[in-house]
Amino acid sequence: MSNLTLSQFLQQEKGNLTPELAQVIDTIAATCKTIDQALQKGALAGILGSAGNENVQGETQKKLDVISNDYLIDALKVHPHVGGLASEELDDFTPAQENGEYLVLFDPLDGSSNIDINMCVGTIFSILPAKNAITQAQDFMQAGTQQVAAGYVLYGPSTMMALTVGNGVAFFTLDPVTQTFLLTTENVQVSADTQEFAINASNQRHWEQPVKQYIEELLAGKTSVREKDFNMRWVACMVGDVHRILCRGGIFLYPYDLKDPKKAGRLRLMYEANPMSMLIEQAGGASTTGRVRILEIEPTELHQRVPVIIGSKNEVERVTSYH
């Protein structure tokens, strides 16, 4: 039996998935194919390296950050069902079509520090219902529970999409010959227990005590109260780390730290934490800041940052109990 295409899969889905939403998701997928092609060319097209400027986050932009952002903006701002866009790379939102039913938020190229060393990167997206005929900045201020779809595209040895429309999580793999996303896994589930964790251990001295205690227990392994050994994984790309968790379980932590105490966290709520939390929860996992469920946070600004602890439910609950 042949694999369903992404478009065929969307036609069969129920619940939040309207024909208009399916069209928006199809457009995102098509644009990610274009991003994938640009990544494949890499140095041959002269598009590696820095673009020579910073984004709104104060981060140095890579050329492919800018290219990927432009591809998504250009494709979605003319889409008849998109009322507005917000990108991690831009200061303000981008108005789109009057009476567009949906708002799209995205990180065009997560993990872009990996580009020049040819390691995995990804695109993350979140879709919210539009509130007004003409989109205003305040319309984006919706909790993650209001998302009607979320997903990412992982550009790795194969190019894959993870997608949820509120009815579980599915994986699609891009056929390099036909350039079609084909359904390869349905009903993705995150195991409740794990022996893998992902954290940037170089920040250990800046962590709060609950996170220090939790990681110390994992590192002590069998000699600690955990009575089993753990392995650490870190690929400097949230898409890569979350994809591993969806495939075989695990916990990912980017906690609050005192390195820059004015920042509530490092990752962006609207572009990273919310869509990834929806995916993980739809697959049976859990997501928190350590103190509150991420999807219940009421945002106050487009580029709001939060701590993120996400993955296998029992581990997330354990580290939360230490806070």
Swiss-Prot record:
Substrate binds at residues 110-113, 200. Its main location: cytoplasm. It catalyses: beta-D-fructose 1,6-bisphosphate + H2O = beta-D-fructose 6-phosphate + phosphate. Keywords: Carbohydrate metabolism, Cytoplasm, Hydrolase, Magnesium, Metal-binding. The keyword Magnesium applies. Binds 2 magnesium ions per subunit. It holds the Pfam family FBPase_C. Mg(2+) 1 binds at residues 88, 107, 109. This is Fructose-1,6-bisphosphatase class 1.
